[in-house]
């Protein structure tokens, strides 16, 4: 697996949302988004949960390595076309 260093392009503010779990209890979901560049591409990725809540501001001058999980989902748009969406969740950031 090739390792690439990432440059921080944008750090989004922490977002906190309340929701009701399936068992009826109130829960809080935290997320914090980042835009990174590889030198060729730019992409958006999110930290979630306690990691997002506890995240310290990143140094815009530093380079980062990220371990993440990429998920895709397909959906049908309003015109009946099948579309795809990717979601990148940050697992580790160093």
Residue ranges and their predicted role:
Residues 1-94:
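Single-stranded nucleic acid-binding surfaces, predominantly the OB-fold ssDNA-binding core
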């Amino acid at each position: 697996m090739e390792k690439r260093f990432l440059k921080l392009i944008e750090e989004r503010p922490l977002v906190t949302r309340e929701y009701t779990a399936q068992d009826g209890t109130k829960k809080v979901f935290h997320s914090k988004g980042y835009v990174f560049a590889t030198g060729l591409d730019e992409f958006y990725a999110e930290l979630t949960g306690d990691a997002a809540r506890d995240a310290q501001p990143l140094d815009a001058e530093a380079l980062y390595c990220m371990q993440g999980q990429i998920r895709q989902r397909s959906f049908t748009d309003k015109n009946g076309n099948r579309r795809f969406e990717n979601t990148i969740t940050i697992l580790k950031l160093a």
